[in-house]
């Protein structure tokens, strides 16, 4: 709420808070905070990455659409990365169409995008990350794809939910695709 001042709440996973889970608990209550705010751990991971790569980047570029929400989010991300990691973050602001063209061409480092649920089910978020698209960083993982494929065809609601819980954890905790 402090960043956008519009009643927004921080996200602690890919699937938005309030999405249905098992009928008694929400998806977020069942899966917990898979993306908690932890600047110390972020710094540890960054330092490990720099060590493995042999150098730190001189700068990183954050692609953002030219709208007030995207620019506010980008400014916050820039501030966090500068403060926590000491990164030089350049914000590259484009029209929505221009941002889309760069993403389609895979000509970006990382970007601010958003997705709103089409329906009250975690799958509205999770199936976006199958089969590698430029808008999702070309992420493509056979295990993730199998979990989503099984969840889409599963007739046992408990097994389907378990597949989706595992998929979100894989995407966020294991593969660190979404933060």
Spans of model-derived segments:
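Bilobed periplasmic-binding protein-like "clamshell/Venus-flytrap" ligand-binding domains
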Residues: 4, 52-69, 114, 155-179
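Solvent-exposed, polar/charged alpha-helical surfaces in well-ordered, non-transmembrane soluble domains
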Residues: 13, 40-48, 72-79, 83, ...
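Solvent-exposed loop/turn segments at secondary-structure junctions
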Residues: 8-10, 19-22, 66-70, 96-98, ...
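Second-shell loop/turn segments in exported
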Residues: 26-35, 64-67, 133-137, 148-155
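Structural transition elements
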Residues: 10-48, 69-71
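Periplasmic-binding protein-like
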Residues: 1-21, 38, 73, 168-179
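Ligand/substrate-recognition segments at binding pockets and active sites
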Residues: 47-117
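Extracytoplasmic/peripheral linker and loop segments enriched in polar/acidic and small residues
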Residues: 88-99, 124-179
